[in-house]
Amino acid sequence: MKKIGSLKLGLSFAGCFLGAGYVSGQELWQFFGSFGTLGVAGLLLALLVLSAAGVLMLNLNRLTGYDEADKLILGGKAGILRHAVTFLELLLLFCIGTVMTAGVGALAHQLLGLPTFVGGLLFAAAVAAVSLAGLAGMVSVFSATVPLLCLISLSFGVYALCRFGFSVGSSDPGNPLMGSWVSAALSFASYNLFAGIAVIAPLGRHMKSSRSVFGGVLVGAGILLCVAGSVLLCVSAAPKYADAELPMLAFASGLSPILAALYGVLLLLAMFGTSVSALVALTNTLKLKSRTLSAHPKAPTLLCAALMFCGSLYGFGDLVGFVYPLLGYLSFVFIILMTIHYIKVKHEQNNLS
């Protein structure tokens, strides 16, 4: 794989997180919109933590050469803790792919009236096919889809601002797993970053310089902020859609069928990019940990895609509200451990120089 610059890193960094929950408004509303004005502060805090930890993770990859989450978080020696990290990483990646597949099922049902399992099945097959191309295929997908995602989201945000004005919903946190805007922000940043380790960390060694790392993460955070701001503006302006499985699609449908179709395409692109990244990271990790699976490169991809489809039948909104917050709190512990590892590596380097 060739060296990449700040722009491609930024697109890949943002693309990992611009999934069904994010762009549909479901995830953003549950984590931030339900806290009213404080939710805005929560979003900014989450993106700050996500960006800082992202730069740290990529630089740690450049310093150590480690790609695997367990080694990046704990170093080369950690015994049973490394197995715990690997298990949680695999679980989180699987859950993300499952949530994205469930999102497509909800999209197919809400937009086209198709049974949810039909859309999910077709989507899982397409994701599996593209994921066989590996890391290079993932970067290509993000380079093509993320700019379009950002442009369409901003257009909807500007439209909502011009038509409805600026509005922030009242504070009404409905999820007991997120008791405050601070805990919601930390949970959001933690599970997103932990899920992205296996996807983003390997790009560190392909960066042109450490300055490119900082610039790329900054670009990615800017894209995430623009999309999140646009989505929250729209849902806050029409809170009656907040209870829908896909709030932003419901908002677009309330405006016109053409806009609903346009946003449906946007959601599909978002879900596709995130699903590909999750499946690539999941299968790469499995193959690194198992010689048997590494000898059969296609089998893990196809099997994981099939299992994600089966898990998606549980339902999109329920998965977002339960899986993400719970895994976010667990991931926060590992983010702290990765920071400690980075400090140790820098200290050792300073002693040698």
Language model segments and positions:
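Transmembrane alpha-helical segments of multi-pass small-molecule transport proteins
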Residues: S6-A14, G42-S51, V55, H83-F94, ...
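Membrane-water interface regions at transmembrane-helix termini and the short interhelical loops
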Residues: Q30-G33, L60-L63, M100-L111, A124-T145, ...
